[in-house]
């Protein structure tokens, strides 16, 4: 099966500025994507309801970061956003998950329940909630149907969590979305940890990740990451990642056993 393929809008935020939403959508539609994830700091959130009827693209989620001082900003978006049913939420109140993060979730979840919106916790390297284990603990503590997790291959790899099969088994009850990137551990990467690259680059074996998810029955969408530091032509990078993903997907369907690796430290 072909999974819906989305791209995060970070790829459109370059050193020279940000491509308008209309251009983002035209590029994504032309290069074969089914949707996008929009960052909460976009100046065009009010236009999201036009995206599906005009370009046929789904808004998979709004990506948002909570840190102390952003309570009103985060709450207002959850209360008012149209055109999507998901918030991907990174938590960064300190060096680990703090009471402030939990209070934020306590405030947001009733609103989400009323509006039919999910929160997908977004483990993020060098943030307070870095690991899948921390996200799972929050899901277990809150035990709320509108709370789940994004499994992000990039952040799992950058954090060097290891134990891919075990981490996926642990996350599956709450899995809402999977995000991917080409990446390699490098002090030149994001946060001095790891690069963000098109899917046909890097040392992270995304084919193995796709296979592990397929064996667990994952049928949801995939999101591709981007970042201004990846360089190159934005349109060309979109093409490369889309082609690499569909190639891996097709290969996996024909040869599912190819994705089963001899166990290593990961």
Segment roles from a protein language model:
Residues 67-149:
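Active-site acidic/histidine proton-transfer and metal-coordination neighborhood
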Residues 53-66, 112, 141-142, 205-209:
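Alpha-helix-loop-beta-strand connector modules within alpha/beta enzyme cores
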Residues 1-9, 18-29, 107-110, 132-147, ...:
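Histidine-acidic metal/acid-base catalytic patches
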Residues 37-39, 61-63, 86-89, 120, ...:
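Conserved beta-strand positions in the central sheet of alpha/beta enzyme cores
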Residues 41-51, 96-105:
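Active-site-adjacent beta->alpha loops and helix N-cap segments on the catalytic face
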Residues 4-20, 62-70, 91-98, 198:
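Active-site mouth loops of central-metabolism enzymes
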Residues 20-44, 82-87:
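Catalytic domains of carbohydrate-active enzymes, especially glycoside hydrolases
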Residues 40-42, 65-68, 91-95, 125-127, ...:
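Active-site-proximal loop/turn and secondary-structure-junction residues that shape catalytic pockets
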């Amino acid at each position: 099966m072909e999974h819906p393929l989305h791209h995060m809008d970070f790829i459109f935020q370059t050193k020279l500025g940000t491509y308008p939403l209309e251009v983002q959508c035209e590029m994504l539609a032309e290069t074969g994507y089914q949707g996008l994830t929009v960052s909460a700091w976009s100046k065009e959130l009010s236009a999201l309801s036009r995206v599906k009827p005009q370009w046929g693209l789904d808004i998979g989620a709004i990506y948002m970061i909570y840190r102390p001082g952003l309570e009103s900003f985060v709450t207002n978006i959850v209360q008012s956003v149209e055109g999507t049913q998901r918030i991907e939420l990174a938590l960064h109140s300190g060096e680990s998950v703090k009471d402030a993060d939990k209070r934020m979730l306590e405030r947001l979840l009733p609103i989400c329940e009323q509006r039919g919106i999910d929160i997908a916790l977004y483990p993020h390297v060098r943030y307070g909630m870095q690991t899948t284990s921390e996200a799972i603990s929050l899901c277990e503590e809150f035990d709320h149907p509108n709370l789940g997790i994004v499994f992000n291959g990039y952040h799992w790899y950058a954090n060097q969590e290891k134990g891919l099969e075990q981490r996926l088994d642990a996350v599956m009850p709450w899995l809402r979305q999977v995000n991917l990137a080409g990446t390699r551990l490098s002090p030149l990467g994001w946060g001095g940890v790891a690069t963000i690259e098109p899917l046909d680059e890097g040392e992270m074996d995304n084919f193995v990740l796709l296979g592990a998810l397929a064996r667990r029955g994952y049928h949801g969408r995939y999101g591709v990451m981007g970042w201004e530091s990846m360089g190159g032509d934005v349109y060309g990078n979109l093409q490369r990642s889309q082609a690499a993903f569909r190639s891996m997907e097709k290969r996996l369907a024909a040869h599912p056993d190819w994705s089963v690796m001899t166990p290593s430290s990961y």
